[in-house]
Amino acid sequence: MPLRVPTRALAAALVLVAACRSTPVVVASKPFTEQRILGELLAQTIEDAGLRVHRKLGLGDTLVLDAALRAGKIDTYVEYTGTALAEVLHDARRGDASVIFATVRDAYAAADLEWMRPLGFDNAFAVVVRGEDAAKLKVTKVSDLGAHAAKLVAGVPRGFGDRADGWQAFLRAYGLHFTRVRQIDPAARYDALTVYDAFGSGASVDLVIGDTTDGEIAHRKLTVLEDDRGFFPTYEAAPVVRRETLRRHPELVDVLNGLGGTVPPDVIRQLNWRVDGEGQDVAAVVRAFRKAQR
């Protein structure tokens, strides 16, 4: 004899399912180009899975997004393992990529947050100098700066100094002493074009803390110095999602993990350059990238 499901119970269940499907997945990002690209990548991928998306791209920095995620104001964004380790967990440990990923994954799990598969690149901090200066001073690694630091002007983004992986800790690790340090506006910290304009005519700084995925580095013929003392941890990019969101939309596990390994370093540099260097629209750049992946 077939089971009878009470009409009211069935109706209530259908309403609940419909509500879950109609509730948009809130995708956020930090306010710099690479993050907007990655946020848009999440958004378009989720939309293609048949879910509605509400974009909050450029919402705020790491701590703003972390607080919003834990409070349920957003559902997902792309974070970097080394940033989570230093800024969120206040952990100064070092290790290979797998150790750092496991550390942040386990710590976030206690807050009901899930780290998905890394996207395929490590966006590490980098000490960047003009190519011609690197050749003239014969510097290839950060420790080579010791003999020249007193003559150089360092450009440091505001907010970088207080991190466990920040400026002061960096100076101590390398024993460097710069007599002139200029702070860069926070917006320029993540805007490769603005930061590296400092290397144009009448440059105000001689080196800057940049990102290894900045498209401007190659196009402006700048040089990244080797972090020969391994000061900076790895910064693998990966989506972080509320587990409540995954329970509501279980298909997101495969959808987001499917992005794992699809954005290697050379690709993210190209995408960053298309937006920062060529002025292309973020959404259009992501659509073209996804089309090429199919």
Predicted regions and their residues:
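Ligand-binding cleft/hinge of the Venus flytrap
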Residues: 42-49, 143-180, 288-292
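Short, well-ordered beta-strand elements
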Residues: 22-34, 42, 51-58, 150-155
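Short helix-initiation/N-cap motifs at beta->coil->alpha
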Residues: 55-67, 158, 179-195
